[in-house]
């Protein structure tokens, strides 16, 4: 087997092959023949699926500098080494079905990367540097142990497909709603109890799958005209299990995002002072300075500064920004024309988040 592999690599070097297939070769170590002398300078695509590799060589980028695609599906790799960040031409990296516990920060150096697949590993977190991947279009991190997503993920401005199924997420960063190119978001099989108020506000986002998040009972009304998956949601549980603000209408009780501190009804015509102040500051920021540098952490707590950068959400009727206070309104799914599409599980509802009593009275999802 070893001699056969050496021969395959030698031929590839001699004939300057751009593609090299070393799948199913029972490799326990990265072939030294690949790293010999100057390496394979012409190689662009390396496929090493279903071997037994545990690591990657530190001089990988030096010996294979023109790699565009690296396919390492189904190995035993535990750590993505720092050297991976030097593969500046890499566009596709597949490390699905390995034993990954750590993705090094240097992955942010892969500025040409378009597709990153890390499904079925042991990851508990992603480095913030993932946000440096400006060309990234596809990110699959399903079937890991992630408790949260990095907020800097919203800086991946080219991201179109995000798959985070079967992790341990309890919340979704509201910053993800700022992704301008996101078309499909799948978060099935997590521990979500609420979704960001602005999720679905972007016209680009057309597909949202949140199946089997049993505590999730409310979907932002922006998702009403999208393709959604919500089977297995809204299973009755003890409210004490979730420490979030709740809102009830009829027999349906939904959890609200953690940033929501207070809710209003049609009788609450006056907004809390903090909410009024935040809205005024936001209008000033957008109308005059276009820059939050005029506010410092000394004059305003960091948590409120972050809300000014990225509001809690926007009114589902008039798009007024909201920060800590909302007027919610529930439309049970079973009472909408979509009920027939979700016969197995209809004990959830669409939640409209409004900025005032006037918008609350006016908003009608079904008109």
From Swiss-Prot:
Output the InterPro entries linked to this UniProt entry: Leu-rich_rpt, Leu-rich_rpt_typical-subtyp, LRR_dom_sf, LRR_domain-containing, LRR_R13L4/SHOC2-like
Question: Which UniProt keywords are present, listed alphabetically?
Answer: Leucine-rich repeat, Repeat
Repeat region (LRR), residues: 16-36, 42-63, 66-87, 89-111, 112-133, 135-156, 158-180, 181-202, 204-226
Taxonomically, the superkingdom here is: Eukaryota
PANTHER family, A to Z: LEUCINE-RICH REPEAT-CONTAINING PROTEIN 28, PTHR48051
Instruction: Give the protein name, as stated in the record.
Output: Leucine-rich repeat-containing protein 28
Biological source species: Mus musculus
List the gene name: Lrrc28
